[in-house]
Swiss-Prot record:
Entry membrane topology: Single-pass membrane protein
Name of the protein this chain belongs to: Uncharacterized protein YufS
Transmembrane segments: 5-22
Underlying gene: yufS
UniProt keyword annotations, A-Z: Membrane, Transmembrane, Transmembrane helix
Compartments it resides in: Membrane
Lineage, highest ranks first: Bacteria, Bacillati, Bacillota, Bacilli, Bacillales
Presence of keyword Transmembrane helix: yes
Protein's organism: Bacillus subtilis (strain 168)
Length: 71
């Protein structure tokens, strides 16, 4: 059991460290994409609040993970 724990934690740490190394190697090229995503979220989701009945009638759109609904 201890070997499984050690192997799983080692695998997790190596994947986590690899992600940080790739991010450092990639640099800050994804900053513009993050800014675009924040603007998209602010414009489409946080500014347009809908009622509970509207929310039930409309399906979730692409990239819509949460929905703010007024009761």
């Amino acid at each position: 059991m201890k070997t499984k724990v050690v192997m799983c934690s080692g695998l997790f740490c190596s994947v986590f460290a690899g992600a940080f190394m790739l991010n450092q190697y990639d640099g800050r090229s994804g900053v513009a994409a993050c800014d675009e995503w924040e603007l998209y979220l602010l414009e489409h989701h946080l500014s347009a609040r809908m009622s509970e009945t509207e929310s039930k009638d409309l399906p979730f759109g692409p990239r819509e993970y949460i929905r703010i609904v007024n009761k």
